[in-house]
């Protein structure tokens, strides 16, 4: 015989309610919040070494400002991040500040899901428009209103293995890679490196894979060098110059055909091969620098090679935005601007991650200039090839993925450059005819 | 509800009882809490969604202008919508068949195993208790990875389980079957245990073999359960989203994107709530058709059996 358990229905109901209450209040009060602190909620997508450095900067800010508590939330990069920001902004109870990609600004409905930046408050914390790289500051506006505070630019760069390049006789007397101009010099350099590697492809980049954007990044570094553009200023006309676009694509195919680049590496494999000195060159964004240093690869970095004229390189920029809030607490708002100003003014610390500060005073700081190899490619900040300012562009956008998918088979030879360009143009036309969720004028 | 007027003090006991009975018969007061929640969280959003599907509203709630059937016209001309609808149908067929047959097979097995029944029950039903995120991440990161995954390691193969467009859907189905077959198994097991034992005894006396008993007693007695399981399974499979979103994100090359993910993509990631609502209503109509067809089928069967 067993006694029935001594729990009445009322006990159970009461107990569950108490538990629910405890759970709800547990959600509302984050650990570490002192009662007198102002809480600033900050969302970002910075992972790996970027994330570690950002976390350190947030910690340093907290030490200098004991009255402010920064609640740092790291979310998954890419589409899921922009989905969450939009949802938070739509609800009007969003984080106080968020990291964002500049090229995404035109697509998020600035003014509806994002709140404008208050220039007076920005001046109060010591930031002036003239402090920022002019083309980037310009792009931080949408319909004439400032919606973003620029933080950095992260251009395509060229990583090179110093040991392998030395063996191939490619380094100058200063130990740096001898810069190349035009197709022939670059091909010559790659052929020499190929010999040292025993015939293995000397160059790797993200060339293949699901949703790969690497081929887009390479193409949009090469093509703008000859002055090529994608869209007219207002985004209404395709302005692709077929000849220039095909020149860039044929060059990419030539790299694959001659075995100078490896068309079968996806993002991870390209970084792994360069890390293990199985390739002499890596074309990638500037953010791999910390990881490569940690893993002890003998490497340095320089600007993306100039092949078709200028030294342009595909880039996007990290910026800070204020997702829309229905009621912004003035005290929290002030603390938010303080926090943004702290991060921007300490851009030299951030540059350790590889990114080029868009805050111009930071570019002159001895701390930054001493960073090797992160300061080697700083001059690119005036040559960045940013996405056209239309709603379907930006990091991890449909445009990048469509163009990446169109050009990936060109490198491996499964598709001719002409077919690749036709596929890209068809995708661009599809994107242009798709309805903009935030039309410029109410129709 | 007209009988709920306050009864005068002179009411006879008989009348009082009558008032009480009809009051509890309606029971409206008791279901009001449920009805309020049902209306607020199901009926109202459903109607709101229908209205949204005729507008171009975005995620910020602006651009809310009436566009008539433009969203539906766009959806019917949208190859990615058709592709995702097709994927949902393929998944439904590929998953429902093994989920029903395997559920029955496992139930028969456990029903006839005479030792450690609790262990078999637990093993087959256990996975069903796991949340979708746990299941998806376990398969994504431990079983399917091409280089170090359990599956390729065991088979000694080099297969891109989730990366090959022609295989990805099968892999998703395999995971889903492992995860959810336990529910059908449990329903079948309960049904098996409620088949009266004397039928089998009588059959044994008549000299029926095990196969005869299965074919002529067990399967017919399970008919209603099978019908129920098929309905539940079809509806569950048509609503597939979690495991695909978590394991493949709809890829590779859109080979696994179900229609619900497409609605999510165009609505929450693409910010076009109006268009997403139209896509959702296309699925809604499909589910209503399946349910109606099922109802008709049931009614016919019930008439035949009576």
Positions of predicted regions on the chain:
Chain A
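Short, well-ordered beta-strand elements
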Residues: 36-47, 68-73, 97
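Short, polar/charged alpha-helical segment
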Residues: 47-69, 403
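Extracytoplasmic "Venus flytrap"/periplasmic binding protein-like
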Residues: 60-132, 141, 167-169, 273, ...
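N-terminal export signals
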Residues: 3-5, 11-29
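Extracytoplasmic/periplasmic substrate-binding proteins
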Residues: 45, 57-58, 217-221, 225-226, ...
């Amino acid at each position: 015989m067993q006694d029935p358990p001594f729990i009445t229905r009322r006990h159970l109901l009461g107990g569950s309610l108490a538990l629910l209450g405890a759970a709800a209040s547990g959600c509302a009060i984050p650990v570490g919040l002192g009662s007198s602190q102002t809480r600033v909620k900050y969302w970002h997508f910075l992972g790996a070494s970027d994330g570690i450095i950002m976390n350190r900067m947030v910690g340093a800010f907290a030490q200098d400002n004991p009255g402010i508590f920064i609640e740092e939330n790291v979310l998954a990069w890419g589409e899921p991040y922009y989905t969450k920001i939009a949802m938070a902004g739509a609800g009007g109870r969003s984080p106080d500040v968020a990291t964002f990609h500049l090229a995404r600004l035109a697509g998020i409905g600035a003014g509806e899901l994002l709140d404008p930046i208050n220039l007076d408050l920005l001046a109060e914390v010591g930031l002036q428009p003239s402090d920022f790289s002019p083309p980037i500051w310009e792009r931080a506006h949408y319909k004439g209103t400032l919606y973003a505070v620029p933080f950095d630019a992260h251009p395509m760069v060229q990583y090179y293995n110093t040991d392998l390049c030395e063996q191939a006789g490619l380094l100058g007397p200063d130990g740096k890679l001898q810069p190349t101009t035009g197709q022939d010099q670059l091909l010559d350099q790659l052929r020499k490196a190929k010999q040292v590697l025993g015939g293995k492809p000397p160059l790797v980049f993200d060339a293949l894979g699901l949703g790969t954007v690497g081929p887009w990044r390479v193409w949009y570094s090469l093509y703008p060098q000859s002055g090529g553009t994608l869209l007219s200023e207002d985004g209404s006309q395709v302005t692709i110059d077929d000849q220039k676009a095909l020149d860039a694509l044929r060059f990419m195919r030539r790299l694959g055909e001659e075995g100078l680049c490896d068309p079968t590496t996806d993002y991870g494999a390209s970084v792994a091969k360069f890390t293990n000195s199985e390739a002499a060159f890596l074309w990638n964004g500037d953010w791999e620098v910390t990881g490569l240093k940690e893993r002890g690869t003998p490497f340095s970095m320089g600007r993306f090679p100039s092949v078709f004229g200028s030294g342009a390189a595909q880039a996007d920029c990290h910026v800070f935005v204020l997702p829309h809030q229905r009621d912004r607490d003035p005290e929290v708002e002030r603390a938010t601007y303080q926090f943004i100003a702290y991060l921007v003014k300490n851009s030299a610390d951030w540059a350790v991650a590889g990114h080029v500060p868009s805050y111009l005073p930071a570019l002159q700081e001895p701390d930054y200039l001493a960073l090797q190899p992160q300061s080697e490619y700083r001059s690119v900040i005036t040559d960045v090839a940013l996405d056209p300012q239309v709603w379907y562009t930006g990091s991890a956008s449909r445009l990048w993925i469509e163009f990446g998918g169109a050009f990936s088979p060109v490198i491996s030879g499964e598709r001719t450059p002409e077919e690749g360009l036709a596929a890209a143009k068809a995708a661009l036309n599809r994107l242009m005819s798709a309805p903009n969720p935030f039309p410029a004028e109410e129709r | 509800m007209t009988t709920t007027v306050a009864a005068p003090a002179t009411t006879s006991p008989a009348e009082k009882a009558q008032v009480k009975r009809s009051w509890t018969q309606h029971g409206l007061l008791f279901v009001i809490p449920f009805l309020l929640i049902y209306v607020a969280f199901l009926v109202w959003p459903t109607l709101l969604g229908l209205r949204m599907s005729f507008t171009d509203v975005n995620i910020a709630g602006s651009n809310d202008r009436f566009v008539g059937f433009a969203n539906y016209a766009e959806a019917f001309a949208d190859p990615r919508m058709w592709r995702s609808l097709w994927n949902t149908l393929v998944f439904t067929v590929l998953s429902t068949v093994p989920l029903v047959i395997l559920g029955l097979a496992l139930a028969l097995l456990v029903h006839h195993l005479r030792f450690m029944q609790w262990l078999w029950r637990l093993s087959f039903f256990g996975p069903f208790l796991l949340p979708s995120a746990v299941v998806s991440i376990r398969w994504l990161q431990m079983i399917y990875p091409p280089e170090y995954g359990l599956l390729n390691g065991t088979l000694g193969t080099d297969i891109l389980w989730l990366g090959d467009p022609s295989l990805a859907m099968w892999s998703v189905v395999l995971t889903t079957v492992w995860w959810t077959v336990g529910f059908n198994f449990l329903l079948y097991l309960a049904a098996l245990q409620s088949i009266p034992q004397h039928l089998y005894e009588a059959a044994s006396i008549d000299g029926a073999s095990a196969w005869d008993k299965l074919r002529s007693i067990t399967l017919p007695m399970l008919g209603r359960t099978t019908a129920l399981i098929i309905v539940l399974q079809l509806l569950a499979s048509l609503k597939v989203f979690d495991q695909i979103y978590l394991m493949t994100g709809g890829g590779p090359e859109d080979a696994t994107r179900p229609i619900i993910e497409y609605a999510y993509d165009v609505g929450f990631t693409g910010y076009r709530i109006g268009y997403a609502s139209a896509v959702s209503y296309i699925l809604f109509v499909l589910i209503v058709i399946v349910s109606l067809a099922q109802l008709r089928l049931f009614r016919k069967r019930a008439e035949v059996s009576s």
